[in-house]
Amino acid sequence: MLFDKYGRSLQKLRYVVNDECNYNCVFCHFEGQSRRQGRYLTAEDYGFVTSVFKSLGVADFKITGGEPLLRGDIDLIVANIAKTGAYVTLTTNGYLLRKWVRKLQAAGLKRANVSIHTTDPEKYSKITGVPPSAFREVLRGLTEARDVGISLKLNAVVLRGINTDRDSVKNLVKLAASLGAALQFIELMPSGWGASVFNELYEPIETLVNIIFELGGRPAGVRKELHNRPLYNIAGVTVELIKNFSNPTFCSGCTTMRLTSDGKLKTCIYADSSVDLMPYIKSRDVEGLLYAVRTALARREPRFKLYSSS
């Protein structure tokens, strides 16, 4: 296993497999990359990269986008990652989940993280920029994913005045319970489109803690291997709180890097710099790829620190 100069291990890799999306969420951070990247990595490329990162001790690989289910070969991407023995998950808005779910399950997908934010179709439309009817299609996809045995986690970005009241939280917990899903609340990030709405919609994650207790929730530990996320349990539903803004504790527990759709390795979603892995991937140059990964890791800096020399 590799460690950066702050002692943080590299355990997880996020694959940003495309930059197209069929939604227009008001806060989209684009996974820290610019739009319209150019040529994409192939399904076979992802298999190669996964095998190399696994040799470094990385075991957890997450597919994201854009909207990854827009890729016509998404099942092949999952299959090429999974055949290495890696644990593979996928983040999606869920609209196309029903179309793909059986192929994804057969390919080896272990879990789908579905961004849903609210159980109110009108609010859902306001957040995502799609018709309210899309919400029902997402629910159908979630139900089918549950039925074929794919583990589920619901994502909800915390948005002031939209989903920060008691009823909104309660309804999301209820939905998660009906699906046997976990639920995670994510602080709004001042990145991508999120920067333009940050002052209007940002609500500290701590606001939800009081609501969680009101709903009978209890502390259930901390995910030290992933951003030191606090966990709660509400009537059997695991709830994670992701405080990613101005939080050194979050950064100190970060064990993740991300590979953009055009083959650039980013050490932090907030960072502009990256290391280009594409030449080594396309030439199947294992030693070159290992060197490039170590170079990126040596440059890795937490976005938020307890102490700064600047």
From Swiss-Prot:
Record bears the keyword RNA-binding: no
Positions contributing to [4Fe-4S] cluster 2 binding: C251, C254, C268
Pathway(s) per entry: Cofactor biosynthesis; molybdopterin biosynthesis
EC number per UniProt: 4.1.99.22
Catalytic activity, reaction form: GTP + AH2 + S-adenosyl-L-methionine = (8S)-3',8-cyclo-7,8-dihydroguanosine 5'-triphosphate + 5'-deoxyadenosine + L-methionine + A + H(+)
Free-text comment on the cofactor: Binds 2 [4Fe-4S] clusters. Binds 1 [4Fe-4S] cluster coordinated with 3 cysteines and an exchangeable S-adenosyl-L-methionine and 1 [4Fe-4S] cluster coordinated with 3 cysteines and the GTP-derived substrate.
InterPro entries named in the record: Aldolase_TIM (IPR013785), Elp3/MiaA/NifB-like_rSAM (IPR006638), MoaA_arc (IPR013485), MoaA_twitch (IPR010505), MoCo_biosynth_MoaA/MoaC (IPR050105), rSAM (IPR007197)
Keyword GTP-binding: yes
Gene Ontology process terms (BP): Mo-molybdopterin cofactor biosynthetic process
Origin: domain of life: Archaea
Top EC class of this enzyme: lyase
Binding site for [4Fe-4S] cluster 1: C21, C25, C28
Signal sequence range: none
Family indicated by similarity: Belongs to the radical SAM superfamily. MoaA family.
Name the record gives this protein: Probable GTP 3',8-cyclase
Organism: Pyrobaculum aerophilum (strain ATCC 51768 / DSM 7523 / JCM 9630 / CIP 104966 / NBRC 100827 / IM2)
Gene: moaA
